[in-house]
Regions:
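Nucleotidyltransferase catalytic core that binds NTPs
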Residues: 1-131
């Protein structure tokens, strides 16, 4: 079984996220999503609209996702790749090169982002339409 792992906050899940998850799953048989915890988001000075538990529930309902695990810090990736026996590490190409150190442990793939969509844009648009 080929295992794929990806990381993210996945707040206000949108079709760009779904596209990434679909393409990541297509690279293997089992997709693991490491989801940024609320505490880790605070360290990154990010505030999610949905809590970790809510975002986890949403991701678990996605047919492409097999397992959701918490992402608690920047340094857990090597341990996660080993623990979950990941064959492929996937991120959006906005992270190109940032995780090449994982090539000693698994294949690293940077997928092109879906054009014209981002969580930041979606949140800004939602604020505009609800004024």
């Amino acid at each position: 079984m080929k295992r794929v792992i990806t990381y993210g906050t996945f707040d206000v899940l949108h079709y760009g996220h779904i596209n990434l998850l679909k393409r990541a799953k297509a690279l293997g048989d089992y997709l693991i999503v490491a989801l940024s915890s609320d505490e880790f988001n605070a360290i990154k000075n990010k505030k999610s609209y949905y809590t970790y538990e809510q975002r986890k529930m949403i991701l678990e309902a996605c047919r492409y996702v097999d397992l959701v695990i918490p992402e608690n810090d920047w340094d857990q990736k090597i341990d996660d790749v080993k623990k979950y026996q990941a064959d492929i590490f996937v991120m959006g190409d906005d992270w190109e090169g940032k995780f090449d150190f994982l090539k000693d442990y698994c294949e690293v793939v940077y997928l092109p982002r879906t054009p014209d969509v981002s969580s930041t844009q979606t949140k800004a648009h939602l604020q505009e339409v609800t004024k």
